[in-house]
Design a protein with these regions (language model features):
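Beta-lactam-recognizing serine transpeptidase/beta-lactamase-like catalytic domain environment
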Residues: 1-38, 43-183
Length: 183
């Protein structure tokens, strides 16, 4: 949900908005493009569950960092999570597990799942402009690992990621946002 309740006089803002570096007319929910971060792990998890037959029975190990190509993927806690199941890796939001899953899935499979969940696709909604979320082709394994945790060059609107989260509660069906003026 998004709501606009300005605490200022919108007429005064209109007079100087062209000079404002904060872009007051940008609807950050539908047009702001940001790395989705850990919310993207939903996409990586869905791809792994569909493509890796034994993934739910596996154990993963998080040491806090892993070298991938010329870079290092780190976990947000720094010291690692130790042994994890897939469920606990998702619950703890383990970057190493999801980076490893992205590498195992390969770029084409992860990108395909991202696209089935709306990345690289124009959303056409009545009365609502939503910018296209982007999952570009990773140029290295390092980029792919970070893409699997929603970092690097992956960009999404907050509305798109909310729609993906909502699909979990809606038996996998992504709902269409509605613009309303009152409840």
């Amino acid at each position: 949900a998004m709501v606009s309740l300005p605490t200022y006089d919108p007429k005064r803002v209109a007079k100087r908005s062209d000079e404002d570096a904060d872009a007051p007319y940008l609807n950050r929910v539908t047009q702001g493009m940001y790395p989705p971060g850990s919310t993207f792990k939903i996409v990586t998890l869905a791809a792994a569950l569909e493509s890796l037959t034994d993934v739910q029975q596996r154990e993963f190990y998080c040491a806090g960092e892993m070298v991938v190509g010329d870079g290092t993927v780190t976990d947000n806690e720094g010291n690692g999570h130790g042994d994890l199941t897939l469920k606990s890796a998702f619950t703890r939001s383990c970057n190493l597990t999801f980076g490893s899953l992205a590498l195992e899935l390969k770029a084409a499979r992860l990108k395909s799942k991202a696209e089935t969940m709306g990345f690289n696709t124009n959303f056409l909604f009545r009365d609502l402009v939503v910018y296209e979320s982007s999952f570009p082709d990773p140029e290295s394994d390092y980029e792919l690992a970070w893409a699997g945790v929603g970092q690097g060059k992956v960009l999404a609107t907050p509305l798109h990621m909310a729609m993906i989260a909502g699909a979990i509660a809606n038996e996998g069906q992504m709902g269409e946002p509605q613009l309303i003026s009152s409840i």
